[in-house]
Swiss-Prot record:
Cited Pfam families: Zip
GO biological-process terms attached to the record: zinc ion import across plasma membrane
Gene Ontology CC, one term: cell periphery
Extra remark beyond the main annotation: Inhibited by Cu(2+) and Fe(3+) ions.
UniProt cross-references to InterPro entries, sorted A to Z: ZIP, Zn/Fe_permease_fun/pln
Family label: Belongs to the ZIP transporter (TC 2.A.5) family.
Region (Disordered): 177-196
Name of the protein: Zinc-regulated transporter 1
Topological type in the membrane: Multi-pass membrane protein
Residues on Cytoplasmic side: 72-80, 144-216, 264-278, 332-354
Length: 376
C-alpha cells in the first residue's frame, strides 16, 4: 500500500477553476498560473547538444578565466597595458550587471512578494528576498572590514591601493622576456619597453614586503567575489541540463555569459601578487570556476527526466542562492570594484585619457551583460 500523500493543492482541477471563483484562493491560482502547482518536467531531448555543453562551457569558462593570468604571469609573453585594463574594467562592468540583471531580478522572480513562493507559508509573512540580499551584503561588508583591520593592525598596511600601486603590480606580474635575454640586451628586469608606439611592461620578481602583506587583504576580497559567482553558476548548470524548449537559445547565451564572468574574475585575480609558495592558487581558483557550471550541467543531465526547475523546492533553493549571490556581488561590484577604482582613487585625474578608457570599458561590460540578460 502506497504511503505517498497527495498534495493538498491537487484537490482542485485547474481546468474547472476560473479567476472569478472565490475558492480556491488567489494564492493557489497564482501558483497554478506560474507553473509551480501541476508543473512538470520540461526535458525534450537534444541529449547530444546538452552533453557537448559540458565540455564547451568547461573549456570556454576556464580559458577566459585563465587568459589574464596567462597574459601577465607566463614568461616571454608581452601584452599592452591597455589590453589588461580592458579586461579588468570590462570585467567590473560584467560583475555589476550580473548582480542586478542576472541575480537580483531572478531572485525576485523566484521568491519575491508577487510569486507563488513569496505568498505562501512563512515566505508570505515578510519580504525575505531583499532581507536575504541585505544580510548577504552586510556579511560581505563585515568580512571586508575585519579583514582590512586585521591586515592593517598586523602589518601596518592599508587595504586601499592607489591606481599607481595597482599598475605597479601589473608591471611586476606582466611577464616578458626572461632575465637572461634582458641581460643580453642590456636591460633590467621590470623595465619599460616601447615598440611601434605601443607600451609594454616586463616581468620582475617582486619581493617587497608590501606586496607580500597586501596579498592577505586582496585575496580575501577576491574569495568573496568568486564565491558569489560560483553560487550563481550552480543553478545555471542545473537548469541548462534539464531545461526544455529554451535550451537552443540558452546554450549559446550561457557560453558568452560564463566567458565574460570568467574574464572579470581572471582580471581581478591577475592583479594579486601571490607568495612563491602559493603560486598555484590562482590557477586552482580559475579551474574551480571553470568546473562549477559543467559539473552542475552534468548533474542536471543525470536528473533531466525528474528535475522540475519550476517546482516549489527548486524555486526556493534558486531564489535563496541568487539573493545571497546578489548581495555579495552588489557590495563587491559597487564598493570593491567601482568605488575603489574610480571614486576613491586619488590618481584617477592624472591621465584623463586612461580614465575615459576605463569608464568606457566598464560601461561596455555592463551593457553587454545586461543585453545577455534578455535571454538568460
Amino acid at each position: 500500500m502506497s504511503n505517498v500523500t497527495t498534495p493538498w493543492w491537487k484537490q482542485w482541477d485547474p481546468s474547472e477553476v476560473t479567476l472569478a471563483d472565490k475558492t480556491p484562493d488567489d494564492v493557489w491560482k497564482t501558483c497554478v498560473l506560474q507553473g509551480v502547482y501541476f508543473g512538470g518536467n520540461e526535458y525534450n531531448g537534444n541529449l547530444g547538444a546538452r552533453i557537448s555543453s559540458v565540455f564547451v562551457i568547461l573549456f570556454v569558462s576556464t580559458f577566459f578565466t585563465m587568459f589574464p593570468l596567462i597574459s601577465t604571469k607566463v614568461k616571454r609573453l608581452r601584452i599592452p597595458l591597455y589590453v589588461y585594463l580592458f579586461a579588468k574594467y570590462f570585467g567590473s562592468g560584467v560583475i555589476v550587471a550580473t548582480a542586478f540583471i542576472h541575480l537580483m531580478d531572478p531572485a525576485y522572480g523566484a521568491i519575491g512578494g508577487t510569486t507563488c513562493v513569496g505568498q505562501t507559508g512563512n515566505w508570505g509573512l515578510y519580504s525575505w528576498c531583499p532581507a536575504i540580499m541585505l544580510t548577504s551584503l552586510t556579511f560581505t561588508f563585515l568580512t571586508d572590514l575585519f579583514s582590512s583591520v586585521w591586515v592593517e593592525r598586523k602589518y601596518g598596511l592599508s587595504h586601499d591601493h592607489t591606481h599607481d600601486e595597482i599598475k605597479d603590480t601589473v608591471v611586476r606580474n606582466t611577464a616578458a622576456v626572461s632575465s637572461e635575454n634582458d641581460n643580453e640586451n642590456g636591460t633590467a628586469n621590470g623595465s619599460h619597453d616601447t615598440k611601434n608606439g605601443v607600451e609594454y611592461y616586463e616581468d620582475s620578481d617582486a619581493t617587497s614586503m608590501d606586496v607580500v602583506q597586501s596579498f592577505q587583504a586582496q585575496f580575501y576580497a577576491f574569495l568573496i567575489l568568486e564565491f558569489g559567482v560560483i553560487f550563481h553558476s550552480v543553478m545555471i548548470g542545473l537548469n541548462l541540463g534539464s531545461v526544455g524548449d529554451e535550451f537552443s537559445s540558452l546554450y549559446p547565451v550561457l557560453v558568452f555569459h560564463q566567458s565574460f564572468e570568467g574574464l572579470g574574475i581572471g582580471a581581478r585575480l591577475s592583479a594579486i601578487e601571490f607568495p612563491r609558495s602559493k603560486r598555484w592558487w590562482p590557477w586552482a581558483l580559475c579551474v574551480a570556476y571553470g568546473l562549477t557550471t559543467p559539473i552542475c550541467v552534468a548533474i542536471g543531465l543525470g536528473v533531466r527526466t525528474r528535475y522540475v526547475s519550476g517546482s516549489y523546492t527548486a524555486l526556493v533553493i534558486s531564489g535563496v542562492l541568487d539573493a545571497i549571490s546578489a548581495g555579495i556581488l552588489l557590495y563587491t561590484g559597487l564598493v570593491e570594484l567601482l568605488a575603489r577604482d574610480f571614486i576613491f582613487n586619488p590618481q584617477r585625474t592624472k591621465d584623463l585619457r586612461e580614465l575615459s578608457f576605463n569608464v568606457i570599458c566598464t560601461l561596455f561590460g555592463a551593457g553587454i551583460m545586461a543585453l545577455i540578460g534578455k535571454w538568460a
